[in-house]
């Protein structure tokens, strides 16, 4: 069955016009937006901005940290002075930014409070008593913090006022602690259950991953489901024992509790239903949306050398590492004797007539950097010793093999590792790259190929179901487990006699394919889904 046919088989969601339900309260989990540029953090920001613009929806954000308590905030309905309210909001900002104790005495008190907090979460998971009360946070006095911390990395400034109209609720309980409370219960009784959030007054809570909590009566939980990789490919993830258990146990509990699931691709929906077929009537597919930063208008190729120089990783120091052979530091940028030599090198390496292959992804096993590097080495040896490789992304986990393989090429001036590249600069790289490569062995959606297409780039991708679904006929595909397959795909795109006309055909197809993920295509699907929930839920 094709992706289109499978997509048609999913339950239809009834659409209720906005005027029939003018005050739908939506609480959106913003935890992923506190960190990271791309992927789930980006989609979280874009979705919040898009929903905040819809008439008849009252959208607020849920502020929660992964491993630290969020302090401050004001209890709903509490009588307090303006000064006291601002002070308590300010405490929340401090705790969201990092350490929030002033001396050792407060540190001891904080440690004891954390111990009691964990036992309260266990009690809530076991008994369902003492729901977690959500504190209020008003944006008005902290507009700069909310914009810079949550939205600026993905949302265009033209939407700034739109997102700053919303307020927030604070969950003081760390996400990881809530997960552990449910996992511990599953260890003893064979079935997970989680603490309950006091979500009275909220119609829909949208979580960005399987959520370690239950909601109040009258609130519907919607899980924005990005992938099942922690369960289906646990060998590729970090902190494997915790992430596999937390994902599966929370997902199982969400399914039992009647949650709805918005999957980012039909491939992800199939993975969900392979684990929990009973969720079929409550699982729909709405693809991720692309940010408006990415568009095909011509860029200035002369800016590429400067972009590469500004965003080089330079030095990277791994955390931990017990083996004596582990490096304490990786030098991830080429050395130069003086600034003039450095400037001349980058101007030549990325000047007129230069070619570079681009990959945008966190460095982690599933992304398959090593395979691309092997294929690129073959192309340099056989055909083009001047072909460059640009890797954009943060350094994740299990990265030693990839980084060790990069070091000699970095010093030779053939490979460049970048990070924290803003969207406008990424648009230039996508458009100027000879080809953008997406070699992953597993994905839930994979933004990078669709973003490259939207910028007018040429894409080669691994032949996995989600890439076939998301990229359609606008990419060249290869076997991600076969280096020669990658070589042949890139050779055909770059060096074959018909490479130029083929690239132009792919650019045109990519613009059409990527248009499916523009906000004007995706947001109406979200609105229909949410109105459908308010109007009685999904209808099969």
Regions found by a protein language model. Give the residues of each.
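Carbohydrate transferase catalytic cores enriched for Leloir-type hexosyltransferases
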Residues: 2-540
């Amino acid at each position: 069955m094709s992706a289109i046919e499978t997509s048609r088989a999913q339950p239809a969601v009834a659409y209720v016009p906005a005027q029939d339900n003018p005050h739908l309260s939506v609480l959106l989990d913003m935890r992923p937006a506190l960190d990271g540029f791309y992927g789930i953090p980006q989609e979280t920001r874009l979705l919040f901005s898009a929903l905040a613009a819809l008439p008849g929806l009252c959208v607020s954000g849920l502020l929660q940290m992964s491993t630290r308590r969020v302090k401050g905030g004001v209890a709903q309905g509490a009588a307090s002075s303006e000064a006291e309210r601002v002070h308590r909001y300010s405490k929340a900002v401090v705790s969201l930014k990092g350490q929030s104790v002033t001396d050792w005495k407060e540190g001891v008190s904080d440690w004891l409070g954390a111990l009691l907090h964990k036992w309260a979460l266990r009690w809530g998971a076991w008994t369902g008593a003492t729901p977690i009360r959500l504190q209020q946070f008003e944006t008005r006095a902290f507009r700069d913090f909310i914009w810079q911390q949550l939205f600026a990395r993905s949302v265009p400034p033209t939407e700034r006022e739109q997102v700053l109209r919303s307020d927030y609720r604070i969950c003081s309980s760390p996400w990881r602690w809530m997960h552990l409370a449910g996992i511990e219960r599953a260890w003893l009784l064979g079935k997970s259950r989680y603490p309950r959030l006091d979500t009275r007054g909220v119609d829909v809570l949208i979580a960005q991953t399987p959520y370690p909590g239950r909601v109040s009566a009258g609130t519907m939980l919607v899980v924005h489901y990005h992938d099942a990789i922690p369960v289906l490919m646990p060998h590729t993830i970090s902190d494997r024992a915790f992430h596999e258990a937390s994902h599966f146990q929370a997902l199982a509990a969400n399914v039992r509790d009647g949650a709805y699931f918005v999957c980012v691709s039909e491939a992800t929906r199939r993975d969900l239903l392979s684990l929990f077929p009973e969720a079929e009537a409550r699982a729909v597919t709405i693809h991720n949306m692309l940010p408006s930063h990415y568009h095909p208008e011509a860029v200035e190729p002369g800016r590429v050398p400067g972009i590469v120089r500004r965003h080089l990783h330079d030095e990277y120091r791994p955390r931990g590492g017990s083996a004596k052979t582990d490096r304490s530091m990786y030098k991830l940028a080429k050395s130069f004797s003086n600034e003039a030599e450095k400037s001349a090198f980058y101007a030549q390496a990325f000047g007129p007539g230069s070619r570079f292959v681009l990959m945008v992804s966190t460095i982690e096993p599933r992304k398959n950097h090593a395979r691309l590097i092997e294929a690129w080495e073959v192309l340099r040896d056989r055909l083009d010793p001047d072909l460059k490789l640009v890797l954009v992304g943060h350094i994740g986990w299990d990265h030693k093999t990839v980084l060790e393989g990069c070091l000699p090429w970095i010093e030779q001036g053939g490979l460049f590792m970048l990070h924290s590249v803003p969207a406008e600069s990424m648009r230039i790289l996508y458009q100027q790259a000879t080809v953008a490569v997406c070699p992953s062995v597993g994905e839930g959606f994979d933004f990078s190929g669709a973003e490259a297409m939207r910028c007018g780039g040429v894409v080669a991708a691994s032949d996995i179901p989600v890439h076939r679904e998301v990229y359609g006929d606008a990419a060249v595909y290869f076997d991600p487990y076969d280096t020669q397959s990658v070589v042949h795909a890139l050779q055909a795109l770059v060096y074959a006699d018909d490479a130029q006309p083929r690239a132009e055909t792919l650019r045109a197809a990519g613009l059409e394919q990527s248009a499916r993920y523009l906000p004007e295509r995706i947001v109406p699907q979200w609105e229909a889904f949410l109105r459908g929930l308010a109007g009685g839920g999904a209808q099969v």
